[in-house]
Amino acid sequence: MEMDDEEEEEEEEDSRRRNGKQASCELCRRDKVRCDHALPVCNRCKARGVSSQCFYHPAPLTRPKGRRIFPLAEGVSFDRARSTGPSESNTPVAADHVSPSRHKPLLPGYLGPTSFVSSLTDDMDLSPDSQGLEVETGQRVLPPYWVQKISEVLLALGDFSTIEELIREYYELSQSAVIASPFIFNSLASVKAICKERIASRDFDDFTSSLTVRIIQNTAETFVIPLTTQGADFHTLFTGPRTRLEIIGVICSLAGRACYFWLAQKKFDSQISRSQFTRKMLAASDAALQTCKILTPLNDLTIWLVHENLLLSHVANGVSSPHVWSRLGELSTDIFALGLHREPKGSTEIPGFMLESRRRQFAAAYQLDKNLATFLGRPPRIPWRYSDCRMPLDISDEALVADGLSLDSPQDGIVDSMGWNINGLFQRSSWLRVRFIISTFRDEILEISLQGMAPSTVRLLEDISNRCHSAWESLPIHLRYNPQSWDNSLPAAVCLMPIFSYLAYLCNDFLIQRLLAEKNNPRGNAALLSVSSDILSTVLRLGTQREHRVDLRQDFTLTILLYGFPSASILIKALQHHKRSGEPFLYEGSRSALIRNLSVFIAHLEAFSHPDNVSYALFQRASQAFSKIIDEILEPGSVAPDTEFEEVSLFDYDQMIDMDGLDWFSTMDFGVAFNQWLF
């Protein structure tokens, strides 16, 4: 009873102005009517049916000098003492002062089997939800700078019809989206309602101000997913009256990336407007993420936001951007801190649909980590040797929100004992599984390549290669690529995913064969030249495809950079060495067909070598270098063996294809080619 009295006294004190009088809610104050000062919502606002707009401003009469750009200039109080449940109210109550903080231990999140508490519990895989992940209680104040940033994020939602069209079209066409579509679509409806309410408000600035306060208070609450939550109701925990900043940041990230891929074509007049929109969405996503790090403990929504922000930054800033690598570090840290890398043992307090969503999130982050580590020649951030997370089941997005579906039982007639769907369907989870399997072998290859060659390396690499081939052959037949995979009766994304998966699979073999070849052997070996030729022909086959609804140029550009350059470099250097030295050419296929493919590849490079292309400098240098070498190869006259390779190349190809660090492009000007990806 004494504690209840103390809490009531503190709450009553928080609702008073500095002059000792009780504060009125903003609606009563503006209408100049008597307020009963009830918390969290006054009875007058309840009677009028405007409870959602009832809030107590910390400094209602404070106004910045000059033009009022952002209505909240004093900072906003937020209380991190409670956990939000489905039945709890999140109506914000702001205070005039900061009450003394009462501290609780800050628990570190997931604690594994070697942690300091492992000997005290039978459950080694401690659930982050059971630990609470609580932080200091009592009221704190979010600085005005971040309050203004949240207002800017909300203003970025101004043209919500464009955002909604971009996201819906992205999910309609994409086979690589990670977050299940029902979670996003249900959230869109709620955020759209907020935007409509703001437009219809009598005072736009005041509504934005009250909405900002409400979102700050909601986001500051510890995000808890009750075990009884159903997938169809999951969005209600972070939308509507409980709208959180994380989901707004996710929506901005998805819209920015969809815009980059030229979706919602009628909404944009030019490439410049698309670039500006993508940059605006990235700025909003960055601001949302940084503010969430201040306001709330780590949760699943935070990981959604970090991942989507990383993907948007990847296309906006370029794959070699320091920002991308830094964000990947954040994502891996958060995944380990929340325990997504470990499969729960025994009973868990996490709903089944959320466990499956976490498996999808981990699989997507794992393969993205391997791609970036390969491209940049750096150690991966999420090594498999410390993880045992199961692959996601090959089920539809809609299955996650279906009633009565057991996601852990393969006997339900949907998936087989290996987790693959039994109906031969193309689903987003199918490609997550395929790319995850390929990435586990890439993980092993990276570990060997970054450690350096040893006497036992050959045996290890051959074993990895054999297991990788066996894994590919064991995939469901409809998910494996063949030259006839491109079927006009199927959506473009369904046709693209087998090509991308096949290229990732071939890249594993390419890396292995390059490591097995002698370091400075310009001839390569038959296996290396063969896989390089397969990669090049697959890249060129992608270049022949056309799709009226999707601009494939962005995908083709990235494919050339990631796969075309390395394979073409190996082949053209081997041809040049054969021309100069007269030694046998180890390629077992048709030499003339290979030269034709290289000529077509050079033609693609030249086609991208125009000032309007963001990678203009890179493609121009590459086309010039490759063209000179092809001219030398086709020239009937002989060339002295001692002629320096650098005389006809703008790249140092010996370094370029030196796979010790898997750094194919160490001599290229990434500042021009990638860091300004959209400009």
Regions found by a protein language model. Give the residues of each.
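Tandem amphipathic alpha-helical repeat scaffolds
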Residues: 254-260, 310-314, 371, 511, ...
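Non-transmembrane, amphipathic alpha-helical segments
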Residues: 98-105, 135-138, 142, 235, ...
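Extended catalytic-interface subdomain
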Residues: 378-389, 398-449
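Intrinsic, low-complexity transcriptional activation domains
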Residues: 1-257, 264-268, 272, 290, ...
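Intrinsically disordered, low-complexity transcriptional activation domains
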Residues: 3, 14-20, 95-96, 100-109, ...
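Short coil/turn connectors between adjacent alpha-helices in alpha-solenoid helical repeat scaffolds
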Residues: 262-277, 314-328, 520-524
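Long, amphipathic alpha-helical regulatory blocks in the mid-to-C-terminal portion
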Residues: 218-230, 276-304, 327-346, 364, ...
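Acidic/serine-rich, low-complexity amphipathic helices located in mid- to C-terminal regulatory regions
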Residues: 310-402, 440, 577
